[in-house]
Amino acid sequence: MAFTWDNQEKLRILQPETEITISQATSKYTPMKKQELYHKVIDYFEQTMPVAETELHYNNPFQLLVAVILSAQCTDKRVNMVTPNLFRDFPDPETMAASNPDVLFDYIRSISYPNNKAKHLWGMANMLVNEYHSEVPSDLDQLVRLPGVGRKTANVIQAVIFEKAAMAVDTHVFRVSHRIGLVPARCTTPYSVEKELVRNFPAELIPKAHHWLILHGRYTCIARQPKCDACGLVMICKHYQNQHKLSAQPCPQTGTVHNKSKKEKGQNKS
């Protein structure tokens, strides 16, 4: 559940020849309707992140599939370091299928779990050649049959390549969705988060929303010590409210004043 401010007090700020009145939020909140919350989130990201795309480097569907398989529990930056040589020598399913896992391993040894991923790449390439005419399928059930491809990877391919209303839920999407109240606390699995997001985002925005949430989680709403000062969603963020209960510091985006948290009070003792 997200929140808006209620039970407001007045804080007066004097400036030369001007008296400005702004709202001071207290600890009492009222629920925000779900669609209102989603509209606020969409408006914010449309303004701050009008272009939101995958950071993986690729030139065709096969290369994106390879890159996404490699990105499991690995950073996009690391994947982008190894794929140029890999794509140079194995530009398509046929050349990769004609190789073997041991050879592929040498190209991806700096990636997490290189042994398993080398086997997955080789198996995936063989299945594409033998069963799908060397084409990456668009159907979810066909995609998840490929070695190394789970629901998350399949949804990335569907959204990015085929522009389908598919929401891939990784750790960033999961974290951000809960923090800003896009999904209820009962959504404890990636699948339940996926269904809730797909249900509430407009279908045409789902592929873009996937990247909004990933990039926001990767660079701003990070797992530890999120950069709340750089975030325009703190007013609807449950995590921010929980961390700043009884805080006497102004909200970074609005100037709203809260009392200091117990942790902050302890740090300020002389």
Segments the model singles out, each with a brief description of its role:
Residues 6, 13, 21-22, 28:
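Short, positively charged and aromatic/hydrophobic N-terminal segments
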Residues 29, 33-250:
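Catalytic cores of DNA base-excision repair glycosylases
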Residues 242-270:
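Short microdomains enriched in Cys/His and/or Lys/Arg
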